[in-house]
């Protein structure tokens, strides 16, 4: 089945308001996906370099945005490598940078990608088509490490029994698919503790997806690279969908906008450091009730933005 990567960009109006794209400016979209946010920037007259490691998403969005001609360029790459991509293209800096850390609906819904717990699919979960699959990961790590992943990345309160059940099923059942994996996870969680609004395997699947794709490592690399990617006056925005990502963005943006680096017990600043970034959003921007009604997945979206001063 071929995926349709068309999607409505989350927090579209807010992105335009915060990034303020102007004709001729150059933006870096680190997560092209369906091309929704890139399309917004291009419609405003900006130029866009967009990254994605999913070849199918890349091809679909490139075809959809072809009408913008040379103003749009797509590169197959992980957004963690944004700085290296720009250097390879001979670009010193951009006027704005954006990442949308959500998983696209086609990736979630297409069973053969291995993200769905409602339909059987292979234990894959890779955003692209290279690297370690979910099955590779589950066979490589031990029960203790699996429990850590579920606890830290999925905030799963029953991480230990879930990890134990998953490792046992992996050894005794072959082949194990995503639908059966979801059943195993649900069976390891007491029925009275099942979440009310989501499938009991949701936290586990989130944690495993993050681990397979090293999503937090990619985000950390993107955040660390911002000072070397943005031109003075350039703005960066990040849309996150769970607390781990939002916490990382919040803490990094706070560090970038902090001037003094002296120990807190010093009565007077001795370092003389000046902040290189300014916060644009004082707190995370959330989707409106109208947008959530139109696009329920926007409910958990959190947007933060900063501007480079010098």
Swiss-Prot record:
Give the enzyme's main class according to its UniProt record, as a single word.
transferase
**E.C. no:** 2.1.1.199
What is a GO molecular function of this protein?
A: rRNA (cytosine-N4-)-methyltransferase activity
UniProt xrefs under Gene3D superfamilies: Putative methyltransferase TM0872, insert domain, Vaccinia Virus protein VP39
Q: Where in the cell is it found?
A: Cytoplasm
The answer to whether the entry has keyword Nucleus is no
Tell me the Gene Ontology biological-process terms attached to this UniProt entry.
rRNA base methylation
Q: Does the record's keyword annotation contain Cytoplasm?
A: yes
Reaction catalysed by this chain? cytidine(1402) in 16S rRNA + S-adenosyl-L-methionine = N(4)-methylcytidine(1402) in 16S rRNA + S-adenosyl-L-homocysteine + H(+)
In terms of InterPro entries, this protein maps to: RsmH (IPR002903), SAM-dep_MeTrfase_MraW_recog (IPR023397), SAM-dependent_MTases_sf (IPR029063)
One Pfam family from the record: Methyltransf_5
UniProt binding sites for S-adenosyl-L-methionine: 35-37, 52, 79, 100, 107
Name the keywords, alphabetized.
Answer: Cytoplasm, Methyltransferase, rRNA processing, S-adenosyl-L-methionine, Transferase
Q: Which residues form a coiled coil?
A: none
What is one GO cellular-component annotation here? cytoplasm
Xref: PANTHER family: 12S RRNA N4-METHYLCYTIDINE METHYLTRANSFERASE, S-ADENOSYL-METHYLTRANSFERASE MRAW
So what does this one do? Answer: Specifically methylates the N4 position of cytidine in position 1402 (C1402) of 16S rRNA.
The family classification in the record reads: Belongs to the methyltransferase superfamily. RsmH family.
Q: What is this protein called?
A: Ribosomal RNA small subunit methyltransferase H
Provenance organism: Anaeromyxobacter sp. (strain K)
The gene that this protein is the product of is rsmH
């Amino acid at each position: 089945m071929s995926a349709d990567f068309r999607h409505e960009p989350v927090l579209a109006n807010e992105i335009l308001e915060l990034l303020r794209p102007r004709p001729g400016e150059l933006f870096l979209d680190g997560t092209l996906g369906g091309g929704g946010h890139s399309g917004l920037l291009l419609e405003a007259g900006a130029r866009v370099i967009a990254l994605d490691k999913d070849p199918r998403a890349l091809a679909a969005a490139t075809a959809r945005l072809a009408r913008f001609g040379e103003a749009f360029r797509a590169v197959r790459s992980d957004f963690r490598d944004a700085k290296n991509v720009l250097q390879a293209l001979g670009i010193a800096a951009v006027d704005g940078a954006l990442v949308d850390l959500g998983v696209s609906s086609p990736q979630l819904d297409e069973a053969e990608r291995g993200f769905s717990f409602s339909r059987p699919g292979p234990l894959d979960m890779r955003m692209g088509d290279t690297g370690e699959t979910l099955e590779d990961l589950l066979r490589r790590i031990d029960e203790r490490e699996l429990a850590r992943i579920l606890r830290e990345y999925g905030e799963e309160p029953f991480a230990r029994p879930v990890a134990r059940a998953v490792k046992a099923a992996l050894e005794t059942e072959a082949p194990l698919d995503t639908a059966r994996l979801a059943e195993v996870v649900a069976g390891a969680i007491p029925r009275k503790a099942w979440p009310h609004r989501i499938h009991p395997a949701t936290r586990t699947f989130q944690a495993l997806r993050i681990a397979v794709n090293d999503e937090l490592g990619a985000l950390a690399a993107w955040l660390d690279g911002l000072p070397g990617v943005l031109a003075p006056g350039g703005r960066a925005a990040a849309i996150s969908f769970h607390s781990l990502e939002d916490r990382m963005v919040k803490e990094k943006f706070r560090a970038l906008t902090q001037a003094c680096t002296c120990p807190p017990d010093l009565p007077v600043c001795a370092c003389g450091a000046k902040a290189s970034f300014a916060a644009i959003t004082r707190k995370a921007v959330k989707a409106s009730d109208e947008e959530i009604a139109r696009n329920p997945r926007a409910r958990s979206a959190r947007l933060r933005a900063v501007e480079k001063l010098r």
